[in-house]
Structures are given as C-alpha cells and as structure tokens.
C-alpha cells in the first residue's frame, strides 16, 4: 500500500493506494492560498493526480470545510469523468438520537456562525452538490462498520456526538428559548 499526503495547508487530504483501487481520505482546506498558490490550483493538481486512477473512492471523515472544500470545488468545476466511484460519509442521520445533531448541523450551516465545536460546517453545500451531481454513489458509515473490505469506521461515536450536541442544545436553549421551542 502507498500513502500519498497532499499539502493543503490547514486541512486534510491523503490517498491510500493499493493495486486494486484507491481511497482518498478527505479533500479540503480552509486556506485560500497554499505556499503562495491559490487553493484551486492545489485542488486541480490533486484532481489531475486522481484522474490517472481508474477505481477511486472518497471517505469524508466529517462535514467541515477543511475536509470537503476540494470535493465541492471538483463537483462544481469538473465534469463527471472526475467523479468518485463511491463517497463514504459518517452516518449522523439514521439513528433517532442523532436528530438533534442533524438539526444543529443544518442550523449552523444556515447561520454560518457555528456553535458546534469551533468548526465551520457545510452540510448544505455537500448535500446540494451531491444532489446536483447524481452520478455519485453515497454510503453512510456508522461506527464499527467495515468498508472497502479492510477499513473500519471509527466515527461517529454517537454517544460522544450526542453529549456534545446536548451541550450545544442546552446553551442555545438558555440563550434563545423561543427559537429553540420552534425548532424542537
């Protein structure tokens, strides 16, 4: 197996390759420039590198821009020949106890002033791009699930996520009780 780490400044992007296929883990940055170059140039280099790989999939570890901005750029600016065979996303959607988390993620995205653990969230942007480009296969990963026949999802830990969500929810309920009554 070969591991290729891409310099994306503040963000994550690396590729795990074996003889059969590759898995890009995250694809984003918060930087507008990386080593003096516009980030779109860095994204284009990564996309060009990936275009030589026939079977490629993507794992997004979570929904922050420093992990998915390159994917959004690619989906907006490149034709479908650059698409991934499969995109793996953390499953924060299926379990009922995660419904508050989903509402807070979407709310944070709407107001662009995230109260969630000090990160910018862009779930709307991702969902919009995936719906617009319906050639992508998406698989939701819950903690412990094996994917690609050799990797195991370690997140989301729904207990930890629920605890963090409850903290944010309680803080928002304290500050904005009328709004929270409408939302929940």
Language-model features: locations:
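Generic recognition of cysteine residues
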Residues: 13-15, 55, 115
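Active-site environment of divalent metal-dependent phosphoester hydrolases
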Residues: 10-12, 31-32, 63-69, 94-97, ...
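Short linear motifs at secondary-structure transitions and domain/linker junctions
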Residues: 1-2, 32-37, 61-65, 126-130, ...
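Conserved beta-strand hairpin/beta-sheet module of binuclear metal-dependent hydrolase folds
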Residues: 1-51
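Flexible, acidic/histidine-containing loops and adjacent segments that form or flank the divalent-metal
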Residues: 1, 73-184
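Active-site-proximal beta-strand/loop segments in catalytic clefts of secreted hydrolases
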Residues: 27-28, 61-63, 156
């Amino acid at each position: 197996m070969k591991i290729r780490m891409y310099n994306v400044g503040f963000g994550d992007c690396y590729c795990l390759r074996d003889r059969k296929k590759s898995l890009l883990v995250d694809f984003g940055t918060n930087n507008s420039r990386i080593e003096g170059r516009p980030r779109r140039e860095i994204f284009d280099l990564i996309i060009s590198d990936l275009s030589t790989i026939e079977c490629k999939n993507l794992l997004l570890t979570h929904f922050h821009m420093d992990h998915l901005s390159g994917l959004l750029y690619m989906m907006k600016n490149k034709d479908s020949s650059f698409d991934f065979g499969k995109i793996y996303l953390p499953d924060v959607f299926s379990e009922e106890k995660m419904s508050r988390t989903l509402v807070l993620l979407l709310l944070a995205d709407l107001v662009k002033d995230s109260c969630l653990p000090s990160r910018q969230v862009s779930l709307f942007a991702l969902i919009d791009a995936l719906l617009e480009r319906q050639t992508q296969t998406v698989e939701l990963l819950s903690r412990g699930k094996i994917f690609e026949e050799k990797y195991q999802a370690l997140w989301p830990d729904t207990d930890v996520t629920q605890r963090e969500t409850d903290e944010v929810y309680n803080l928002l309920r304290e500050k904005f009780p009328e709004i929270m009554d409408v939302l929940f």
